[in-house]
Amino acid sequence: SRTGKQFKNLAHIELALIGFFKQNPDVILDGELYNHKLKNDFEKIISLVRKQKPTADDRLDAQHLVQFHVYDYFDGVKYDSYKTRMQQLSFNKQIYCASIKFVPARLVDSYNYARDIHAEFLDQGYEGSIIRLDGLYKHGRSYDLMKFKDFSDTEATIIGYETGKGKRQGTLGK
């Protein structure tokens, strides 16, 4: 994980990357655990990833459903531009397989082009897109990175509620 926590149900991803990291021990692959087939059930991915004592069935489900989507690369030594890091990711094709996916980037030079690409991603079922400046790698949050999402705002009238029970006591909802 980003904080160094080891996940116990992702042996298939670890196995897919072990050779790469033996040859490149200082490299950081930045990405997220995802599967676009589960875009409407992200909780399923989270549930499989967070299993502390996975069963054989849990491991099999994770192997078929959880993928690591790689979108950035840092070699631990050089501070390269994003464009150079993307080239490194595309050169290392040996790591990509059913469990490891490369997230391609496109150079955007206008707001209209960014909107067009964003519309493509929405049509494919993604919730948005990411805009990244051609800057140096930065661990954690970065001002070089911005989410591009569409939001809708609406008002509603509350017609009823339930009081919370157990750990939700004193709040609304189950």
Question: What is each stretch, according to the model?
Answer:
Residues 1-98:
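Covalent nucleotidyltransferase
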Residues 1-3, 58-60, 64-65, 73-76, ...:
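Nucleic-acid 5′ end/cap handling module spanning
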